[in-house]
Amino acid sequence: MLPLSQWLVGAELRWFRLWLGLGLILIAAVFYLSLTPVDIPAEHLDKIYHAATYGVMMGWFVQLYRGVRSHAILAVGFILMGVLIEVLQGFHPMRYFDVLDMLANAVGVLIAWAIGTTAFSRILVRFESLLH
C-alpha cells in the first residue's frame, strides 16, 4: 500500500485544507440543492446541469488526489452519490426519481475523470505557484 503522500497532491498544495474544505462545501451544496424544491423550466437542460455539476465536483477532487486508484474511488463515490440523491428524490413530494439524471451525473464524472488525466489536474498547483 502506498503512503498517504503518494495519494495526495496536498504535499504540493500549500492550501490543501482550504481546497478540500471548498470541495466539501460543494458536495454539501449539491446535496442541499438536490433535495430542496427547485423549478427548472427546460427539462432537457436539466441533464446538462447534472453532468456539469458532477463534472465540476469530480474535476475539483481530481486536483487534490493523484493516481488512477484514487480517481477511480472518487468516480465511484460521486456516481453512488448521484444514485443516492436520485433515490432520496423519489421520496420527496416535490422531486422525482429519474434514471436519466443518474446517467447524466455519471457522464459528467467520467468526462471530468478523463480531463483530469491532462494538465487540468494541476490547475490548483499552478494557481498557488502564481501567488508565491
Report residues per predicted region.
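Interfacial helix-loop-helix junctions of multi-pass membrane proteins
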Residues: I40-K47, G82-L110
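Membrane-proximal cytoplasmic C-terminal regulatory module of class A 7TM GPCRs
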Residues: T118-H132
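Short, highly charged low-complexity linear segments
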Residues: L13-F16, V87-Y96, I115-R122
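Alpha-helical transmembrane segments of multi-pass membrane proteins
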Residues: A29-S34, M58-G59, F78-I85, V109, ...
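"…centered on the first transmembrane helix and the immediately adjacent amphipathic helix/loop
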Residues: M1-Q63, L74
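Membrane-embedded alpha-helical segments that form the functional core of polytopic membrane enzymes
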Residues: G67-V83
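Short helix-capping/hinge motifs at transmembrane helix termini and TM-loop junctions
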Residues: S34-P37, Y65-R66, P93-M94, F120
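Membrane-interfacial alpha-helical segments at the cytosolic side of multi-pass membrane proteins
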Residues: A51-H71, V109-F120
